[in-house]
């Protein structure tokens, strides 16, 4: 707005989003975000034009036509880092610049954009811990500060129109769970920083406890900036002379993981093509068992903590991070089903689905990714249940069939068969499947040597 009269435009690429496995929750959440953004921009005298460009291939023509209609001299846009998005942006930029319209990209999706944090030899990091050290040093040295809100401009008369449906879902789908406005995101951040963050390092792994920020959907669509989150956390850290900063440091680490996985994605195009970061693991022969996959997806495995996590995902569009690790390891380690199937399923359900973070998490669990868990490390869902849902509060909340179950049964679900006949028996023997997976990995590694 400092460079002249400004209009905003957003492209609805509904067909591409469907191909990219966007969930109904995310599509509806986006509509609510756009509705709220329209009101926010109107207060600044800035119109928002919503264009229906079903495929990324349509973006160039729609933006060029719109730019000509309003006499635009310059296009400002935020980069996205998956391969399809990078190709789309490059095509748009080339076309507009060939037609005399300057383009200026920005990077607001992350705290620090890809290739801004590199090793001393100029190569990208593939291990998180040294990446984190350099990230923290850069954050401390740069002293991030939020920009003031611009002054209102003289409004340009443009029609603002938002289609009523995306991917066969309306904007009110999941509205009570995920209001789509910056004020709500700001309130969540305020509530988190004013108390929960002090306990975050101790409570974040317990799904029955409201111990996380719940900001991931708002970060995923840019409703709130990760830099704003970091700035607020840094301010709190500097003024927090009474309480230890363990919670703040742990939460900031989650922002760093988000940057890390996106950097890895941007620097390795094979990941966007459905390939593993560890190229040799693309040769792994995974189980193909539709019945097992369907039982996992529906939350009917017979392992309560796994089923509770999957039912939370299917119902709300969100899953606690500890449960994301438990359920993904169960699929890739105990069922030995291809991580890509789970990755796509999560994206098709998550309101906060981000390709890089979701892919990074799945490849971590499957031992195919960068800085991944070793193949022999497998979360035992029964021990995880004992540790992180000891009284079964979360399990009972998500699985009505187990509302009256004794917590001791959650660590031994075979004992429930007679009392809780509506809940399925365990679908596998954990010990047997663990041994099978270890054998498969050992044999696979031998083929590489």
Predicted stretch roles:
Residues 1-143, 241, 311, 439-444, ...:
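Trp/Phe/Arg-rich N-terminal binding region typifying the photolyase-homology
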């Amino acid at each position: 707005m400092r460079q002249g009269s400004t209009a905003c435009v957003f492209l609805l690429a509904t067909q591409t989003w469907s191909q990219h496995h966007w969930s109904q929750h995310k599509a509806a959440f986006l509509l609510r975000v756009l509705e709220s953004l329209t009101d926010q921009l109107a207060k600044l005298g800035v119109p928002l034009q919503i264009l229906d460009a079903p495929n990324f291939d349509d973006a160039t023509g729609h933006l060029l036509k719109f730019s000509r209609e309003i006499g635009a001299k310059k296009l400002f846009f935020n980069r996205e880092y998956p391969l399809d998005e990078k190709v789309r942006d490059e095509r748009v930029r080339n076309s507009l610049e060939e037609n005399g319209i300057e383009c200026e990209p920005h990077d607001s999706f992350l705290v620090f954009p890809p290739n801004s944090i590199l090793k001393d030899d100029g190569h990208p990091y593939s291990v998180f811990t040294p990446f984190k050290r350099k990230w923290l040093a850069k954050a401390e040295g740069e002293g991030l500060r939020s920009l003031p809100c611009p002054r209102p401009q003289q409004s340009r008369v443009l029609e603002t129109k938002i289609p009523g449906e995306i991917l066969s879902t309306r904007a009110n789908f999941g509205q009570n769970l995920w209001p789509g406005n910056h004020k709500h995101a700001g309130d969540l951040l305020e509530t988190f920083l004013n108390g929960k963050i002090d306990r975050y390092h101790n409570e974040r792994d317990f799904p029955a406890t409201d111990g996380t920020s719940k900001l991931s959907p708002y970060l995923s669509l840019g409703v709130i900036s990760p830099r704003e989150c970091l700035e607020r956390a840094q301010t709190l850290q500097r003024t927090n002379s009474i309480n230890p900063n363990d919670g703040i440091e742990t939460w900031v680490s989650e922002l760093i993981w988000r940057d890390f996985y996106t950097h890895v994605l941007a620097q390795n195009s094979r990941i966007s093509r459905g390939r593993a970061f560890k190229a040799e693991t693309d040769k792994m022969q995974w189980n193909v068992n539709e019945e097992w996959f369907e039982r996992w997806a529906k939350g009917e495995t017979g392992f309560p903590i796994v089923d509770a996590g999957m039912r939370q995902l299917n119902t709300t569009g969100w899953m606690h991070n500890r449960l994301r690790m438990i359920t993904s390891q169960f699929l890739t380690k105990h069922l030995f089903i291809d991580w890509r199937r789970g990755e796509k399923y999560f994206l098709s359900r998550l309101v906060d689905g981000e390709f890089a973070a979701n892919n990074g998490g799945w490849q971590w669990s499957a031992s195919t990714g960068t800085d991944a868990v070793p193949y022999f490390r497998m979360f035992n869902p029964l021990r995880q249940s004992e540790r992180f849902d000891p009284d079964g509060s979360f399990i009972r909340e998500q699985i009505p069939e187990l509302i009256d179950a004794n917590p001791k049964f959650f660590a031994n679900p075979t004992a429930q068969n007679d009392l809780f006949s509506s809940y399925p028996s365990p679908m596998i023997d954990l010990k047997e499947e663990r041994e099978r997976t270890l054998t498969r990995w050992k044999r696979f590694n031998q083929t590489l040597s």
